[in-house]
Amino acid sequence: KKKKVANISIDGITKIRIQGLEGWSDIQNVKPDIKRNEENGGVNLIIFDADTIHNEGGFDKRKQEIHDKISGTTCEIFLFPNNQDDGALEDLFENIINTKNAPIFDCWNKFETCLQDSASPKVGRDLTIPAKKSKIYVYLEALLGKSKEEKKKIKDPFRNFDDTDHWDLDTDYLNPLKDFITKHL
């Protein structure tokens, strides 16, 4: 499988290399790259979801598992959503929405409650609550226009996280991530 890599160069010199992985358990596959970067004087920053006990993770557990997989290297680790709680990138997104758009999530939460409390008994079995990725997708879908071009902006690679109509980039919730990145760049 082809590695996802992005390089950020300043004055023609690569300063930042971003290595995409399929998930935290893949990290041992790039351990040689981590060691090589370390030997060349680089700093290794690792950013993953902390996950929750519901998907065999959690902040403390995930951090330890990553340390175990990359033992013998020096890395700085940040786990979404805020480098202290269980959760994922989508939890961070949920906490940085523009507050004027909070009613969209209020509706979503009512939908989840309805599925659990009303629809499940009527269907005769427990229903699956859609993933948090779906919640973020629906949030953006509700805010963006109906044209094909606007709908494209809902998808991961085309999302505009600088759009202050959608996201509050000044919220204190982002401070742990901002501090982590600022400290190491």
Roles of regions detected by a PLM:
Residues 2-4, 34, 66-70, 97, ...:
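Hydrophobic, Leu/Ile/Phe/Ala-enriched alpha-helical segments that form helix-helix packing faces
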Residues 143-185:
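Charged phosphate-binding loop/patch that engages nucleotide di/tri-phosphates or the phosphate backbone
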Residues 15, 45, 89-90, 137, ...:
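Generic secondary-structure boundary/loop-capping signal
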Residues 44-48, 53, 164-165, 179:
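Small/polar/charged residue-enriched interaction surfaces, especially the RNA/DNA-contacting tracks
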Residues 1-45:
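RecA-like P-loop NTPase motor core
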Residues 49-148:
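Activity-critical C-terminal alpha-helical subdomain
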